[in-house]
Amino acid sequence: MYKQQRILFLTLYTFSLTGGIEKVCRSVIKMLSDLVVELCYHVDALSLYDHEKVDKYTPHVHFEYVKGNKIRFLWKALKAGSKADTIILSHINLLIFGLIIKKMRPKTRIILFAHGIEIWKKLSSWKRAFLSTNVEIWAVSTYTAMMIRDKHGIDRARIYILNNGLDPFLQPVPAFEKPDHLIQKHHLSGNHRILFTLARLSSSEQYKGYDIVLEAMRSLPSNVVYLLSGQADEAEKKRILKLIDDYQLNDRVRLTGFLPDDQLSDYYLLADIFVMPSLGEGFGITFIEAAAHGCPSVAGNLDGSRDALLNGRLGSLVDPKNVKEVASAIRTQLEKGRLPKHSLSLQQECLKHFSYQQHKLNFIHLL
């Protein structure tokens, strides 16, 4: 008799934040929802901190959120976990729940998504031991897999690669015209060449590379404008504004603040280059979002950005600590220009590897 596969997906956030990990969670929960119909799976999903859900991602999944109530989360996780064949954990901070369920049901399969910086930090001895013996680790990039192996001594054979993919509801743009309303909003003209970074601007991280871009701007033509977007804490905003002032870039840098998801497409179309020469990116979903809009990237060659850029096929990989190399790559990309045929080719290459359907096929293969 056929035994229905039961999956429990545990997350910290899925819909109430908009970072890279949350984008991954939204795609995963939509894939699991598809599998309920396609393979007759039973899927429960439980979020610790969410206070809302978006129904289009969860039509066939039993999704609950507990608004930060850890006791309620534990009770619901153990209840659903006692029946599940597979537990998928979206974050290392949920590992304790995998451990408890594994103690209750030793045959339960435990899968952990490993994104980047959150799992490169020092781990307690019990986490390292549990990861080494009882958990399948699905890393978002080759770099993240290597960091887990090197930092924690975990056998590389226990670590699988599942690159991130595009949102299931992202529609490839049919044309690559710059939006007039953003040109007007940011006081731009047809003569301006536009660099764009979308990142969390955090004083506690500072690995996204926008410092290097600001420094590189000093040697770039005066018609190059830099749009730096993302939520910033007060300390980091103050530091960035000082850099802009020190480099005399006040007329050439725009801090846009947080951009909601429904505005991102227009900003990717506005940009000539998406530039983020990071030093600690686990993957970088923004790189593939840019490419899906025909926008090439300049990224660092020392982290997971290499996977996102297909080792240079979706843009330029540079030493993220070398200002001259970053500036040179930007100049080279600007000289090429964003011709429609180039944008279309870039978009097609991106969709071939990172479309939602391809992401789902890769996910099912590992599952």
Label every PLM stretch briefly:
Residues 143, 165:
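Carbohydrate-associated surface elements
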Residues 8-10, 189-208, 214-217, 227:
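Conserved donor-binding/catalytic core segment of Leloir-type glycosyltransferases
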Residues 279:
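Aromatic "clamp/platform" in nucleotide-sugar-dependent glycosyltransferases that forms part
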Residues 45-50, 198-201, 225-241:
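Glycosyltransferase donor-sugar binding loop
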Residues 296-299:
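Short hydrophobic beta-strand element within catalytic cores of glycosyltransferases
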Residues 258-259, 266-271:
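Short alpha-helical donor nucleotide-sugar binding micro-motif in glycosyltransferases
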Residues 238-259:
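Nucleotide-activated donor-binding/catalytic signature segment of Leloir-type glycosyltransferases, i.e.
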Residues 311-312, 316-323, 332-337:
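Conserved acidic donor-binding segment of nucleotide-sugar-dependent glycosyltransferases
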